[in-house]
Amino acid sequence: MAQRMGLYLQDKHDIKYELQIAQYAEEKGFSEIWQADTRLARDCIVMMSALLTHTSRIKIGSGVLPIYTRNPAVIAASWSTMWELAGLTPDGESRVMLGLGAWWEPIASRVGADRRSPLKAMRENIEAIRALFTMEEISYEGEFVQLDHVKLDVAYGSTDPRNIPIYIGATGPKMLQLSGEICDGPVLNYVVSTDYIKDAVGQVEIGAQRSGREISAIDRPELLACSLSDDD
């Protein structure tokens, strides 16, 4: 797997400046940008759309979108729209990536989100979204997701399948395993020890084996905190 370098954007800078950062990152060969959406600050879909229209090659992903804030069909429609907006990379891959998370406390309970059974809720959301990305009509009956003959009803745009990679912002062992089992991979956390990362990758591998895949086939982007200075 080729070494890559990306950026993780939150809301630390003026929006116009962050768009300039994205253009600079693309010019310098960065592979991707992940836009945060865990706080009630900047909406990742709005920011991702802006980043996509101000760049032409770099990949843009959500890092990560809480599954409790939107219906999975709406999530699929939003990412399908960004897929059309962005076009493909020079290698023919989707420029847009979908990172999903189970949100966190206390913000979730403060807005009335019911985070029970996050593992099951995550599985159902990903299965439904992945099915909708085929552009076929689907029905899904789960505890958290119910879809009755639903499809991405694109009338004038491309109806090609949306080969959009899906990631989980996973921290615990079971969610890490799920990311290896049904996703393109996890988005690994930052400000953690190397021992934690080694164990996390081991959990991802357990999940990958359940679906008959090798760990080498699982993408594993990791967030890193760093401080830059003009001084040597």
What are these regions (language model features)?
Residues Q3-K16, L65-P72, P161-T171, C226-S229:
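Active-site mouth loops of central-metabolism enzymes
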Residues M5-L9, I33-Q35, I60-G63, V96-L100, ...:
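Hydrophobic faces of well-ordered beta-strands that scaffold small-molecule active sites
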Residues D11-H13, R39, P66-Y68, A102-P106, ...:
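Active-site-proximal loop/turn and secondary-structure-junction residues that shape catalytic pockets
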Residues E18-L19, I45, P72-A76, K198:
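Conserved strand-to-helix beginnings and helix N-cap segments that scaffold or border functional pockets
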Residues D232:
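Active-site pocket-lining/capping segments in soluble small-molecule metabolic enzymes
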